[in-house]
């Protein structure tokens, strides 16, 4: 199992840090965003990516990627539906019952799920390994792809 930029759902320890103030302020605009205005949506998504990326943000690449996404989707607002999910089952402490070999990959400067979330997850899963990506936010920059792939391959071989 490989968990990337994740949090320990069902966490029952001391409070873990959450979204950065910049991210909360940005997401506060979701309610007033005109989802029929492609330029406004693209600008909102580009700022979301900038806030997620950390120092490796490539505005040109991300703008092109967002255009491609908007060309292919009928409902860009649905990208944010996961925030409305709820569960009926109590998951308190359930992550501690994971029994398979687990690798947790987390960005050092993640503004959505700050590093203590990844650390708590890795510490709570028996024998889990933690790979911290220096200078990285919530997204996986291309400069880390090869190292992540090697680490996942080694993790799989060792499982």
Model-identified regions with their sequence ranges:
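Short beta-strand/loop motif that positions the catalytic acidic residue
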Residues: 98, 104-106
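Conserved alpha/beta-hydrolase "acid-adjacent" motif
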Residues: 111-117
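Flexible "cap/lid" loop of the alpha/beta hydrolase fold
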Residues: 2-34
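Catalytic active-site module of serine/aspartate enzymes centered on a nucleophile-bearing elbow/loop
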Residues: 127-159
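Solvent-exposed polar/charged
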Residues: 96, 123-124
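Active-site acidic short loop of glycosyltransferases
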Residues: 99-100, 127
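Alpha/beta-hydrolase
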Residues: 21-93, 100, 120
């Amino acid at each position: 199992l490989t968990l990337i930029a994740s949090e320990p759902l069902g966490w029952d320890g001391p409070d873990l840090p959450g979204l950065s103030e910049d991210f909360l302020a940005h997401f506060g605009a979701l309610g007033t965003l005109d989802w029929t205005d492609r330029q406004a949506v693209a600008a909102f998504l580009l700022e979301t990516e900038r806030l997620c990326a950390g120092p490796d943000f490539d505005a040109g690449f991300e703008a092109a990627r967002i255009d491609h996404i908007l060309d292919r989707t009928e409902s860009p607002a649905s990208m944010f539906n996961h925030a409305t999910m709820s569960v009926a089952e109590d998951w308190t402490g359930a992550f501690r019952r994971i029994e398979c070999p687990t690798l947790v990959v987390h960005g050092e400067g993640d503004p959505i799920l700050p590093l203590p979330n990844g650390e708590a997850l890795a510490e709570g899963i028996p024998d889990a390994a933690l790979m911290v990506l220096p200078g990285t936010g919530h997204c996986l920059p291309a400069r880390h792809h090869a190292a992540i792939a090697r680490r996942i391959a080694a993790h799989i071989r060792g499982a």
